[in-house]
A protein has these predicted regions:
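Charged, solvent-exposed interaction patches on well-folded alpha/beta domains
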Residues: 1-40, 50, 55, 63-66, ...
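Short glycine-enriched loops at secondary-structure junctions
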Residues: 44-47
Length: 268
């Protein structure tokens, strides 16, 4: 009899527990603090915030727990993997995105954009690529502030994917060079950036490339011979400083050779 009475005494506590849990669930569902009331988008370089919000599928009033989770890492950081996937699919210029919950009532979109650093021309226009060779945009007019990669032709073009060309080794050499230029431009000591001064990149056989560089002070053209390798970033940094100091101003046309142990300028 005592055992039966003990069993019966457990039931009220169990029902109270269920009632409390149901009440908590109801509060979580109904309270405004668990509803989306703002979407945080950082200042973007090439995208407008409203199209990004529209493509995300997020709407004000949506419950914050809807779509939350995914794998363990995404759950631990309160992320929305479906929102991230939608944005990556909608915008080829987005390199990475993190959609995460921020109490109260906010979802933050942290977006890293790809930056166009060169382009490849084709009969109807050109395609701009980033430093990894990913196709970003198709334009009819050739841009003036980034270089053209000559000697390669696109064979397959899918925005958001690496551009496929007829000479992959040449494209790889150009991509390596662009990476070295971007690294050199991170140095804060020189007064000018190198990338905007480069008009053409033409890979040769092997690891060598020709660059056409515009001298910033005079507007003259300088042909530069470079070579992919561990010293290429240092070579590009040296070239950047030389341009800033006007080292080749007024010397006429010629070729600056950066491939040997000594940097030499040979007039035409």
């Amino acid at each position: 009899m005592k055992r039966e009475g003990h069993r019966r005494s457990r039931w009220p506590g169990f029902f109270i527990f269920l009632a409390i849990m149901a009440l908590i669930g109801l509060l979580v569902w109904l309270l405004p603090v668990f509803r989306l009331n703002s979407i945080e988008v950082p200042e973007l370089r090439s995208l407008d915030s409203q199209p990004v919000i529209d493509a995300s599928g997020l709407v004000i009033g949506r419950h914050l727990f809807r779509g939350l989770g995914g794998n363990l890492d995404q759950m631990a950081h309160l992320r929305y993997p479906q929102v991230e996937a939608k944005l990556l699919a909608a915008f080829p210029t987005i390199k990475s995105v993190r959609a995460s919950l921020k109490f109260p009532g906010k979802i933050s979109l942290a977006i890293e954009e790809r930056v166009e650093v060169a382009y490849v021309s084709f009969p109807d226009g050109c395609v701009m690529i980033d430093k990894e060779g990913v196709a970003l945009k198709i334009w009819q007019d050739e841009p003036q502030d980034i270089p053209i990669i000559e000697g390669v032709s696109a064979t397959s073009l899918v925005l958001g994917k690496p551009l496929e060309v007829d000479v992959p080794s040449a494209m790889n050499s150009a991509i390596t060079l662009m990476g070295a230029i971007i690294e050199a431009d991170k140095d804060s000591r020189a007064a000018i950036r190198l990338l905007p001064q480069i008009r053409t990149i033409r890979p040769l056989t092997g690891s060598r490339l020709y660059l056409t560089v515009i001298l910033p002070r005079t507007g003259e053209e300088l042909t530069v011979l470079s070579e992919t390798g561990q010293d290429q970033t240092e070579d590009m940094l040296w070239l950047r400083f030389a341009l800033a100091q006007g080292s080749f101003d007024g010397r006429g046309k010629g070729v600056l050779d950066l491939t040997g142990s000594r940097k030499t300028f040979t007039p035409d």
